[in-house]
Amino acid sequence: QRVALARALAIHPQVLLLDEPLSALDAKIRVELRSEIRRIQRQLGITTIYVTHDQEEALSLSDRIVVMSAGQVEQIGTPFEIYNYPRTAFTAAFIGQLNMLPVTIADPQTGMCTFEGQPVATGEPIEAATGAAKHLAIRPEELGLGHSPGDNHLDGRIEAVTFLGAIVRVRVDLGDTFLSVDLFNERLLTLPQVNQAVTVNFPPHACWVTE
């Protein structure tokens, strides 16, 4: 891969097209080459179009990302914009992990919803009619376990705990819906137990309403 990249750069192209150049490599080498490609691109100042299905590659390498579905552009923006402010449900679900919570709009002006009768605040007005059925999108890293003043709270039971190294992913059963909660791993962390009753918390600004 390094030789192929060197050959492409030898002719001093105005635009460099890379079509999934790291897909056949193992994880560690892929991360190393990803950083190397980014360093070379910035050093030489060559406009680069990088095609990938790897979301982490797209977020870490890009100045701007184009998210496409079925040949149509879903959204164009910086990695920060694409991840934190997705404009479509497809973009939100495609980039990173995402929880989708079925809710009913209670008060569009104040951004209040309900989930199985429990109030959920979004912190901003909602463009939908009272009583409309929507979904609340929340990233797993925005969720926590336990009570937190001023946050939304949903009661559930732990269905699974998966250790992923830097994070611990907890799958919480809310009845007919599951939430993934990502906890930052630290040596003093007490791992939750399967079947343990828990309360999931998240701040109103961490979620947004979608179809």
Residue ranges of model-derived segments:
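ABC ATPase nucleotide-binding domains
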Residues: Q1-F90
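Non-catalytic connector elements of ABC transporters
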Residues: L98-M100, P108-E211
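Hydrophobic alpha-helical segments and their boundary regions
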Residues: R34, T47, Y85, A106, ...
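Short acidic/glycine-rich beta-turn/loop cap or linker motifs at sensory/regulatory domain boundaries
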Residues: A70, A106-D107
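Nucleotide-binding/hydrolysis machinery
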Residues: F94
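Short beta-strand-centered aromatic/proline hotspots
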Residues: V103
